[in-house]
Amino acid sequence: MPKMKTKSAVKKRFKVTATGRVKVQAAGKRHGMIKRSKKFIRNARGTMVLSDPDTKIVKQFMPYSF
């Protein structure tokens, strides 16, 4: 049976930590920042950890990183 391929789109957007959790950049900071609150901009600055159901979905697309 051939090796499973990793989805390139998922590989570019998600990082797996040493403990197996998935980090992703917070959404909503591409354009239209005038109408966003300062609190929203501040909170979206860093990365966030995906929830368990979302992590399960990402694992299917990155078979060799867990």
Curated annotation (Swiss-Prot):
Keyword flag Ribonucleoprotein: yes
Keywords attached to this entry: Ribonucleoprotein, Ribosomal protein
The protein's name in its UniProt record: Large ribosomal subunit protein bL35
Similarity comment: family membership: Belongs to the bacterial ribosomal protein bL35 family.
Lineage of origin: Bacteria, Pseudomonadati, Pseudomonadota, Alphaproteobacteria, Hyphomicrobiales
InterPro entries for the chain: Ribosomal_bL35, Ribosomal_bL35-like, Ribosomal_bL35_CS, Ribosomal_bL35_sf
An example Gene Ontology CC term for this record: cytosolic large ribosomal subunit
Record-level GO BP terms: translation
One Pfam family cited in the UniProt record for this chain: Ribosomal_L35p
Highest taxon of the lineage: Bacteria
Gene Ontology molecular function terms on file: structural constituent of ribosome
